[in-house]
């Protein structure tokens, strides 16, 4: 082998899954590489080393934790298989994804890292015990379980909420075909603190507790959550003319079933109203109130310790939106929802650290007009 020539990873290889096995695959010429190699730490260290072009001598020096002969042999095998190739090789058609990702190496690296997961076979009790339960015991000996409760910065108690707001307190659609049909079913319900409370009770409030293995007592809510982690927080943005509550910004305090007022300027209140109503179909309607959903990542990441634990958080958020939509349709409310919230604006106004808690979505209820999105 030429130890001066520079080599690089053939980035058209992708990690694919079949059942519980992982394998490397290149779609251009339908080349697949053995699944077993993806469990080899040296393989991935070599892969990382050759993400940028380098000579074989340089790579051996970089991987000094390994025996040089072992590294050289592994590199030679990866070169022979086509996983590593000489820089400037032009004798094949490159995967378009390589070009698309050439300007975002961090995204490509993240994809690689998040693909190196030692998947748990939940059909195998021994695998669950070894990779899940025993690992949680180890983590608990070193770390504290993140709390399910959070009190927002710069907030103070404002409105204690009733644990039950009966649906019969409002006009409501008692026919599923009316509530969920194509025809609009607006009802003359006045927007009020009671309506806000009812929606919170179905989407955010604690209903019970559950004991989980190792991590102890956790919350139950009207929405399911992966591992009972419930990472989604609610910030309530209230406009004018909402009965029983002052215009302003509030954080829903789950522990005390309470709205805590957050002290912000009127210009910041307007900024949050606009941020939650970012889509054209929402901007064109009178603002009533909105739930801005944020996520405290640590809650889920403590339990699901892999780079793609964001999927569990998105499942949770989807369930929350579903419950909000169901309740709003039954009440005949005019609403909009969006996952296009301008995070930087929300995080700035609410003084959130985006590495700990970030804006995810918004659910907006409009005043007076009779239209559902």
From Swiss-Prot:
The keyword Cytoplasm applies. The keyword Signal does not apply. InterPro entries: Bacteriocin_Proc_Enz, Nitroreductase, Nitroreductase-like, SagB-type_dehydrogenase. This is Trifolitoxin-processing protein TfxB. Keywords: Cytoplasm. The gene is tfxB. It comes from Rhizobium leguminosarum bv. trifolii. Its main location: cytoplasm. To E.coli McbC which is involved in the processing of microcin B17 (MCCB17). Coiled coil: none annotated. The actions of the proteins TfxB, TfxD and TfxF are implicated in the processing of the inactive trifolitoxin (TfxA) precursor into the active peptide. Pfam families: Nitroreductase.
């Amino acid at each position: 082998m030429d130890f001066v020539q520079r080599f690089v990873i053939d980035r058209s290889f992708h990690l694919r899954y079949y059942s519980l096995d992982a394998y490397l695959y290149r779609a251009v010429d339908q080349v697949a590489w053995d699944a077993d190699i993806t469990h080899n730490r040296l393989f991935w260290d070599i892969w990382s080393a050759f993400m940028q072009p380098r000579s074989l001598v340089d790579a051996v020096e970089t991987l000094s934790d390994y025996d040089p002969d072992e590294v050289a042999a592994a590199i030679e095998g990866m070169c022979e298989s086509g996983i590593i190739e000489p820089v400037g090789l032009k004798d094949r058609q490159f995967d378009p994804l390589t070009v698309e990702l050439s300007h975002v190496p961090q995204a490509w690296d993240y994809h690689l890292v998040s693909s190196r997961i030692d998947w748990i076979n939940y059909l195998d009790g021994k695998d669950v015990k070894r990779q899940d339960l025993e690992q949680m015991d180890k983590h608990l000996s070193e770390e504290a379980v993140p709390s399910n409760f959070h009190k927002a910065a710069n907030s103070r108690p404002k409105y204690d909420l009733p644990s039950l707001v009966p649906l019969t307190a409002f006009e409501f659609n008692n026919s599923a075909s009316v509530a969920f049909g194509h025809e609009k079913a607006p009802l003359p319900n006045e927007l009020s603190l009671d309506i806000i409370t009812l929606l919170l009770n179905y989407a955010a409030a604690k209903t019970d507790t559950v004991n989980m293995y190792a991590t102890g007592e956790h919350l139950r809510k009207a929405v399911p959550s992966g591992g009972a982690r419930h990472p989604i927080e609610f910030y309530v943005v209230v406009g004018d003319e909402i009965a029983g509550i002052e215009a302003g910004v509030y954080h829903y305090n789950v522990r005390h079933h309470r709205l805590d007022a957050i002290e912000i300027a009127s210009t910041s209140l307007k900024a949050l109203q606009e941020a939650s109503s970012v889509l054209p179909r929402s901007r064109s309607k009178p603002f009533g109130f909105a739930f801005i959903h944020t996520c405290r990542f640590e809650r889920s990441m403590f339990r699901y310790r892999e780079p793609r634990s964001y999927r569990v958080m998105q499942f949770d958020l989807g369930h929350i939106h579903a419950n909000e939509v169901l309740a709003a349709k039954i009440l005949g409310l005019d609403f909009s929802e969006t996952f296009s919230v301008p995070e930087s604006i929300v995080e700035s106004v609410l003084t959130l650290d985006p590495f700990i808690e970030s804006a995810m979505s918004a659910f907006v209820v409009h005043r007076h007009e009779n239209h559902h999105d």
